[in-house]
Amino acid sequence: MGGSASSQLDEGKCAYIRGKTEAAIKNFSPYYSRQYSVAFCNHVRTEVEQQRDLTSQFLKTKPPLAPGTILYEAELSQFSEDIKKWKERYVVVKNDYAVESYENKEAYQRGAAPKCRILPAGGKVLTSEDEYNLLSDRHFPDPLASSEKENTQPFVVLPKEFPVYLWQPFFRHGYFCFHEAADQKRFSALLSDCVRHLNHDYMKQMTFEAQAFLEAVQFFRQEKGHYGSWEMITGDEIQILSNLVMEELLPTLQTDLLPKMKGKKNDRKRTWLGLLEEAYTLVQHQVSEGLSALKEECRALTKGLEGTIRSDMDQIVNSKNYLIGKIKAMVAQPAEKSCLESVQPFLASILEELMGPVSSGFSEVRVLFEKEVNEVSQNFQTTKDSVQLKEHLDRLMNLPLHSVKMEPCYTKVNLLHERLQDLKSRFRFPHIDLVVQRTQNYMQELMENAVFTFEQLLSPHLQGEASKTAVAIEKVKLRVLKQYDYDSSTIRKKIFQEALVQITLPTVQKALASTCKPELQKYEQFIFADHTNMIHVENVYEEILHQILLDETLKVIKEAAILKKHNLFEDNMALPSESVSSLTDLKPPTGSNQASPARRASAILPGVLGSETLSNEVFQESEEEKQPEVPSSLAKGESLSLPGPSPPPDGTEQVIISRVDDPVVNPVATEDTAGLPGTCSSELEFGGTLEDEEPAQEEPEPITASGSLKALRKLLTASVEVPVDSAPVMEEDTNGESHVPQENEEEEEKEPSQAAAIHPDNCEESEVSEREAQPPCPEAHGEELGGFPEVGSPASPPASGGLTEEPLGPMEGELPGEACTLTAHEGRGGKCTEEGDASQQEGCTLGSDPICLSESQVSEEQEEMGGQSSAAQATASVNAEEIKVARIHECQWVVEDAPNPDVLLSHKDDVKEGEGGQESFPELPSEE
């Protein structure tokens, strides 16, 4: 290219540009290779753990447009740089946002190549000649400008009244002209859309390669002392890397070439723009080849690492967490000090300046949507024509792409340029355009989702009567507006979060660059040699700084939401009505670790070990946060009873329990809240509630064998009475250990009517509830747990209302008085065959029904945890054991109505099985 006759760069200058480009790629390669490995490791980890984005969204997401969708086509006047003349061209813009110019419409239709193709990434659209001259002169450092007289001749003579200028940093500028102001407005609005999307669409990509490239650019620029955002990160990776090279080349080209240029100012400017375009094209060509080769090397490297990453994932995660702890200990104090002095005092004021224009822009989008839907509704009520309604709906679907109608919404956000002027001096953040354009893209996205959701919800009602269709239009509109309000709040909080971090992070990075960053090298010793490609101390350091700032920004955003500023919603508010399928895409896949109950529990429990929950959860609205007033049964430590195989005849079960925040590998999915710090385990054990908490009024319907419990309950009308001789035992227990309050005796007399409806199969559940008041036996930690829990007295009267409302739910009520059952699988209380037979004759059915399997397992796990809670409980357990053994022989059942003999027969067999399996359990030593 350099030696051609048309080239304005001589061969020496072209060779110089090639050399600088090659050196830049060589210097950039190590950064990209490191970040590629790190990003690939994170990608594999996300894939293995099946992590999902939990950001709630109620509007349905509109599918992307089909490739080649035409956004604009028209005939207009365009200035041709090659012949220095205006020509009539047929311009087509598709959804790749490239501006293609054809000789005429016929040439386009027959598939001819375009005369020119412009990608306006990084460009600026102007409609005033004065504004264009100011901008172009600012980027043309002419050394002769001061000695030259004022140039009154326009750079381009306009053939028509309404021009559109497209300024670009390293390309020749584009000039277009129109006869009508409406045509000018339509084309300029569309060009602005193209610039916005080309500037930011690449940065929105979630591929690990894109993330690796952007991280590499950030670290590459930091080594040169440039922190924070960069206005030249626009376009795709080839354009961004070419911009990096041109950033280094530009001073040299200006010094070498500008003084040698002759002629008038406009001629020199035109020559300079031609040189820049030629140099940039040369750089882009070489960058494209170099980056392609670099990617192939990185792919080959990660292909060899994939096996190591997958097999050592747990070790890699633990190693990184350990490194985070070490570096955070070093960074935390100076980082927090820098935040306290340079960031915290300004966060609230910056947020206030952001909220006004951004919120007014989203409000304008809402108003526009409502206005367009009202027009559709009024037209239909007038015409009653369903065919015309379909046409109006099609036009409504194209509303987000109608640049002229959307432009008033976008201009509301342009006020940020005036509001955030102080940022340029205080935080050295001159790139407000990036915040504005990103916000405008979010606004367009939300409008797309709103019109798509409206069309989807209305489509089933289009074939009915006209009156019903008109009513449906209004109802669907109101529903979509509610969903829009919630999604708007979520997106705006995300915008504020990103903007605040982007504005303030460079300040903290610069403050710590001289003190903390040099210390990072010594922490590399904590990384295993096999994992040096997947973990880098620089990345961990940046993550920690980002997290510290994120925590600070989330505080001010939450405060604004609590104060209801600009219609921001709180995270735990009652959510608006949503469509059935609005949340279906958010459901985690089957087997997802993140979606498992144990992981959800660990995410909301403070102090859970092993959790890597970062505070980026201002936008993650889990079920527990959405409806805090209705705690689920899982959140209280209860379990869903699933049909499963019965325990083996010997009475033993194998329960695999990992750490608290890991899922329990058994047929029952449980969530355990027994690990709350500072809480007595006896209050939080299965079925218990906190003192200040009200018991749940509604509980999710658990999964059980269909109809079995209901059918058996109808057969039984037995009521349980408290034997008189059990009173002394109760009194002794109350005086000795103070586990049963005095008011229990009164409440127990009031409960026989409720207990009458309880199926004998669920006697074990009562034992679980009664057992919780007793501190666990210290000997229980040394033996394998199995079977069913021991018998004890309740610690406090539970709420039994939930039992009557949800008969299939886990039992929270307790049997009255000292009436209790002797579990056939219990081996710790000695041989109890006689009592077991007696209880069978009295009509109490004992068995190993799988419906109670989960209660047994949860109780066993909680027994282990509760046994370590305090030394006082361990001491009291000796007396408790004596009382338990004594009480076992006093358990009696008084049955008024005999149950179904077939049911008793089947359960008698289960009892015999359980008695046979007693021998497999080690007996506890006598406490006498």
UniProtKB/Swiss-Prot annotation:
A lipid is attached at G2 (N-myristoyl glycine). InterPro entries: Niban-like. Residues 825-834, 905-915 have a biased composition (Basic and acidic residues). Residues 801-818, 865-877 have a biased composition (Low complexity). Expressed in various types of thyroid tumor such as papillary thyroid carcinomas and oxyphilic thyroid tumors but not in normal thyroid tissue (at protein level). Strongly expressed in heart, skeletal muscle, pancreas, white blood cells and prostate with moderate expression in colon and spleen. Expressed in renal carcinoma cells but not in normal kidney. Residues 580-596 have a biased composition (Polar residues). The keyword Heme does not apply. Residues 690-701 have a biased composition (Acidic residues). 'Niban' means 'second' in Japanese. Regulates phosphorylation of a number of proteins involved in translation regulation including EIF2A, EIF4EBP1 and RPS6KB1. May be involved in the endoplasmic reticulum stress response. This is Protein Niban 1. It comes from Homo sapiens (Human). The gene is NIBAN1.
